[in-house]
Amino acid sequence: AVCVSLLGAANIPPQPLNLLQFKNMIQCAGSRLWVAYVKYGCYCGPGGTGTPLDQLDRCCQTHDHCYDNAKKFGNCIPYFKSYEYTCNKPDLTCTDAKGSCARNVCDCDRAAAICFAAAPYNLANFGINKETHCQ
């Protein structure tokens, strides 16, 4: 089940449902807030180039590649594809049909959330200048 608080929602721009689901998966698998990953390293957040800075940054690079692979299956747009999953902290289970776009995207997000939870967090890699550190 997905629970989303609408308190303060007037100040939050609308986001694709998938990104909300991914945020909730991150919270289910680990203890860090999703915002800790938005500007981390070379690959966490929008885009990504260069060599990943550490294990956590590699999790984000792998997630990017997973989404790229999901896009190869028909009309699958990962950022906008909602999916079904269950959270039994810290376990995540994707429940859509295997091979479907929704399942592929869910599997990408699940793997990333688990990877994030297992990876050490280096505060020095948050908010770096990607132009100078990610060549």
Curated annotation (Swiss-Prot):
Q: What is its EC number?
A: 3.1.1.4
What tissue expression does the UniProt record report for this protein?
Expressed by the venom gland.
List ligand-binding residues for Ca(2+).
Answer: 43, 45, 47, 64
| Disulphide-bonded residues | 28-87, 42-134, 44-60, 59-115, 66-108, 76-101, 94-106
**Cofactor dependence:** Ca(2+)
Give the UniProt record's GO annotations in the biological process aspect. Answer: arachidonate secretion; fatty acid biosynthetic process; lipid catabolic process; phospholipid metabolic process; positive regulation of fibroblast proliferation
Biological source species = Bungarus fasciatus
The cellular location(s) given in this protein's UniProt record come to: Secreted
The record ties this protein, via InterPro entries, to: PLipase_A2 (IPR001211), PLipase_A2_Asp_AS (IPR033112), PLipase_A2_dom (IPR016090), PLipase_A2_dom_sf (IPR036444), PLipase_A2_His_AS (IPR033113)
Q: What PANTHER family does the annotation carry?
A: PHOSPHOLIPASE A2, PHOSPHOLIPASE A2 FAMILY MEMBER
What are the positions of the active site?
Answer: 63, 109
- Give one Pfam family: Phospholip_A2_1
Tell me how the cofactor is bound: Binds 1 Ca(2+) ion.
Similarity comment text for this entry: Belongs to the phospholipase A2 family. Group I subfamily. D49 sub-subfamily.
Please spell out the taxonomic lineage of the organism that makes this protein.
Eukaryota, Metazoa, Chordata, Craniata, Vertebrata
Q: Name one GO molecular function term.
A: phospholipid binding
Q: What is this protein called?
A: Basic phospholipase A2 KBf-VA
CDD domains linked: PLA2c
Q: Which UniProt keywords apply?
A: Calcium, Disulfide bond, Hydrolase, Lipid degradation, Lipid metabolism, Metal-binding, Neurotoxin, Presynaptic neurotoxin, Secreted, Signal, Toxin
- Physiological role: Snake venom phospholipase A2 (PLA2) that inhibits neuromuscular transmission by blocking acetylcholine release from the nerve termini. PLA2 catalyzes the calcium-dependent hydrolysis of the 2-acyl groups in 3-sn-phosphoglycerides.
Catalytic activity line of the entry: a 1,2-diacyl-sn-glycero-3-phosphocholine + H2O = a 1-acyl-sn-glycero-3-phosphocholine + a fatty acid + H(+)
This protein's GO cellular component annotations are: extracellular region
Matching Gene3D superfamilies, A to Z?
Phospholipase A2 domain
